[in-house]
């Protein structure tokens, strides 16, 4: 059973039966653990030993953060502290041996066992990912059929934070030597500055991202709510994990979900 076949089988079980029967599946123990406990693994998963010649490890060469190390036996190790979730290694891999973490199974489990309301925080990118037939209303209805209480569009908080950054820019920039690195929306941008150009961090506004702001707002209105972020960006998972590890008290575990 390939990894994709395993993933689809487990997803079907979770939807139809309400749980995954892992003991009935003949698959790699490593693959099973990644799908059942993605939070315990890096954002990028090597599925098998790398088939490329050692001097042509394209994924490692594409990583700006030196997060990928190739062992002598050909297996790859991804450093979760260095990986920012940019996805460059996945695009560079010519054998299709790398995949982004899949978090749908834990998301469905969180919806099923939630003791309070469950809200989907939807990234603005959904407007360009589906056909024009998929309206916000239809998407909200689909989430409700899956067990969600409702849907919140994160675009609203992006607008609010853009205004906040504009006000900060107006307050902080007075001379030709003053500058501010904007865009709190992008965790990849912030991660790059923090890890490669850390001396510039004082020039980054202190605003949280729209995803975090949306989660905080929902938790303010419904303290017992579960919030699940839905979007196409792998780096949002790194951001969510950072907030969780920092004991983020403004909201529940916010995970990025990819179809």
Predicted features by range, described:
Residues 1-62, 66:
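Ferredoxin-type iron-sulfur electron-transfer modules and their immediate structural context
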Residues 2-14, 28, 101-259:
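Iron-sulfur-associated redox domains of electron-transfer enzymes in respiratory
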Residues 21, 79, 255-259:
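A diffuse structural propensity rather than consistent per-protein peaks
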Residues 21, 32, 37, 41, ...:
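Residue-level detector of short coil/turn "hinge" positions at structural boundaries
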Residues 36-37, 66, 80-84, 115-120, ...:
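Short amphipathic alpha-helical segments, especially helix-boundary/capping motifs
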Residues 42-46, 76-83, 221-230:
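Immediate flanking context of iron-sulfur cluster ligation sites
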Residues 52, 82, 203-207:
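Alpha-helix N-cap/helix-initiation motif
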Residues 54-84, 88-104:
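Iron-sulfur cluster-binding cysteine motifs and their immediate structural context
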């Amino acid at each position: 059973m390939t990894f994709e076949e395993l993933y689809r089988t487990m997803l079907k079980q979770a939807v139809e039966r309400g749980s995954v029967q892992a003991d009935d599946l003949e698959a790699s123990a490593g693959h099973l653990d990644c799908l059942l406990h993605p939070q315990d693994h890096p954002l990028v998963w090597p599925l098998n030993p790398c088939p490329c010649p050692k001097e042509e490890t394209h994924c490692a060469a594409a990583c700006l953060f030196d997060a990928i190390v190739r062992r002598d036996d050909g297996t790859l190790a991804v450093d979760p502290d260095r990986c920012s979730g940019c996805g460059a290694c996945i695009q560079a891999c010519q054998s299709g041996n790398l995949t982004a973490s899949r978090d749908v199974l834990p998301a469905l489990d969180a919806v099923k066992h939630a003791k309070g309301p469950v809200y989907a925080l939807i990234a603005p990118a959904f407007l360009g990912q589906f056909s024009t037939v998929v309206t916000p209303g239809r998407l909200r209805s689909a989430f409700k059929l899956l067990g969600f209480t409702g849907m919140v569009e994160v675009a609203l908080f992006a607008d609010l934070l853009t205004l906040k950054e504009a006000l900060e820019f107006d307050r902080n920039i007075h001379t030709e030597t003053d500058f501010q690195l904007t865009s709190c929306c992008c965790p990849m941008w912030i991660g790059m500055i923090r890890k490669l150009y850390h001396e510039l961090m004082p020039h980054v506004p202190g605003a949280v991202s729209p995803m975090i702001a949306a989660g905080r707002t929902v938790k303010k209105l419904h303290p017992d709510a579960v919030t699940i972020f839905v979007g196409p960006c792998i780096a949002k998972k790194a951001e969510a994990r950072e907030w969780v590890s920092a004991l983020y008290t403004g909201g529940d575990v916010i995970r990025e979900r990819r179809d």
